[in-house]
Amino acid sequence: MKKINIFCCTIENFDLLNKLPKNIIPLGLGKKDFPSNWLNDKNGKNISNLNKYFGEATGMYWIWKNKLNDYSSDDWIGFCQYRRLWLNDLLDSKQKYSSSNLFSKLLKNDNKNFDTNDSVILQPTFFETDSLRGQFVKNYGSKVLDDCLNLLDANDKNDFKDYLEGNSLSICNMFIAKPLIFDK
């Protein structure tokens, strides 16, 4: 039977995370202390001290360096956030929020996406009136983006420039992948 573990990244200790199904594993990030039954990015090989700069990526790094070998090629590794969980079905916006409503909709191992894919990402978010580059420049200016582009080799730079001219992206550092894909 394939194993599907979703690591739920958080910088806070929320009681709700202790009530999640066993395959959704709380992963505490950053400086704070977390319950002993949680994983945290301060043990083993880690870059926890960089969490204030890289957010969930410190947890992803920790899983990559410390847990990846615990998985077989048929297993799945995923990430979500304490405010954004993977669901099988959409919550009806008129539905009253309760943990039982939420828990009944959480992603299940028998979801058909796991039968036909090696990775799953969020449905993209689309910008209606601007490109990704335009949106970034409006918020942060062009210097940072241009400096980053100049760090890339020619092929990657051109590919990334093309991507930035598009208007869609998958947000939130949420994905689920087979270990081989995650390792890349």
Question: Residue locations for each model-derived region?
Answer:
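ER/Golgi luminal nucleotide-sugar-dependent glycosyltransferases, focusing on the catalytic module
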Residues: 1-184
